[in-house]
């Protein structure tokens, strides 16, 4: 692996707003009477979240699909790219750790539901009943009814993505990640996307630049962008803060 020096960090934060109900599956409530067949994922304290791994994995998969950067394993499975040298591998890391040539750039935090005042997480849940139809009879197949727990449309999650900066060219890697976020807005997050689940929008987005001098005690070296409502506005905000990092 190339020996690179950390120049700073760029933090991307904002809100993920659900435009349709979303289901990211959790552990089945097998011991609960009346528990749903397919609950949404929660942490150990019962809080509803979008796992960072789900957000990161979806954005990576969309970028790989767009660029044709995936491999077939001979058994009909399509695996993540792992050359270790392209933009996608630099951002997310290669699939095979033996091919790591540079430090992985991105950290994607878990995104937690942000309830409004006087509301609890469970106020943002709904049960959607789905069924499987007999193609000849036009009726529900026996055993074909299932209950899906969803986080309701309009729910908001606070997200944070951290980019470790080593080179001046890492600016292009941040732009590449933002490209993946744009693809996600026109795709879906979680399961059952073809049934209309998981349409999302990124809102209230801003960038925070913390050069290495910030971590050495110079708090005034931190720069923040304006908060924007669209990913299309984010690239110009990146240009404004990028000068805060010293690459000499």
UniProtKB/Swiss-Prot annotation:
One GO-annotated biological process of the protein: defense response to virus
Gene Ontology MF terms in the entry: endonuclease activity; metal ion binding; RNA binding
InterPro entries: CRISPR-assoc_RAMP_Csm3, CRISPR_Csm3_endoribonuclease, RAMP_III_fam
Keyword Methyltransferase: no
Keyword Cell membrane attributed: no
UniProt keyword annotations, A-Z: Antiviral defense, Endonuclease, Hydrolase, Metal-binding, Nuclease, RNA-binding, Zinc
Top-level EC class as recorded in UniProt: hydrolase
Residues that coordinate or bind Zn(2+): 81, 83, 89
Listed EC numbers: 3.1.-.-
Extra remark beyond the main annotation: Encoded in a type III-A CRISPR locus.
Role of this protein: CRISPR (clustered regularly interspaced short palindromic repeat) is an adaptive immune system that provides protection against mobile genetic elements (viruses, transposable elements and conjugative plasmids). CRISPR clusters contain spacers, sequences complementary to antecedent mobile elements, and target invading nucleic acids. CRISPR clusters are transcribed and processed into CRISPR RNA (crRNA).
Subunit relationships: Part of the Csm effector complex that includes Cas10, Csm2, Csm3, Csm4 and Csm5. Stable Csm3-Csm4 (which crystallizes as 2 heterodimers) and Cas10-Csm1-Csm3-Csm4 subcomplexes can be isolated; Cas10 and Csm3 probably do not directly interact.
NCBIfam families to which the protein is assigned, alphabetical: cas7_TM1809
UniProt record similarity statement: Belongs to the CRISPR-associated Csm3 family.
UniProt cross-references to PANTHER family, sorted A to Z: CRISPR SYSTEM CMS ENDORIBONUCLEASE CSM3
Name of this chain's protein: CRISPR system Cms endoribonuclease Csm3
Protein species of origin: Methanocaldococcus jannaschii (strain ATCC 43067 / DSM 2661 / JAL-1 / JCM 10045 / NBRC 100440) (Methanococcus jannaschii)
Name of the gene this protein is made from: csm3
């Amino acid at each position: 692996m190339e020996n690179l020096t950390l120049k700073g960090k760029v933090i991307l934060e904002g809100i993920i707003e659900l435009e349709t109900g979303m289901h990211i599956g959790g552990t089945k409530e097998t011991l609960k009477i009346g528990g749903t067949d397919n609950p949404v994922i929660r942490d150990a304290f019962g809080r509803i979240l979008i796992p960072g791994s789900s957000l990161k994995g979806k954005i990576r998969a969309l970028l790989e699909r767009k660029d044709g950067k995936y491999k077939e394993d001979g058994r009909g499975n399509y695996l993540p790219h792992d050359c270790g040298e392209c933009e996608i591998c630099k951002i997310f890391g290669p699939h095979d750790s033996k091919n790591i040539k540079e430090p992985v750039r991105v950290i994607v935090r878990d995104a937690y539901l942000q309830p409004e005042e006087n509301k609890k997480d469970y106020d943002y849940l709904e049960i959607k009943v789905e069924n499987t139809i007999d193609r000849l009879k036009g009726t529900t197949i026996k055993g074909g009814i299932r209950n899906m727990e969803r986080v309701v449309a309009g729910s908001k999650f606070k997200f944070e993505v951290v980019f470790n900066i080593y080179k001046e060219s890492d600016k292009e890697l941040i732009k590449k990640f933002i490209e993946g976020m744009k693809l996600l807005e026109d795709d879906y997050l979680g399961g059952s996307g073809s049934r209309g689940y998981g349409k999302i929008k990124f809102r209230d987005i801003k960038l925070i630049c913390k050069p290495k001098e910030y971590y050495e005690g110079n708090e005034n070296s931190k720069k923040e962008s304006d908060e924007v409502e669209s990913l299309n506005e984010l690239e110009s905000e990146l240009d404004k803060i990028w000068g805060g990092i010293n690459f000499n």
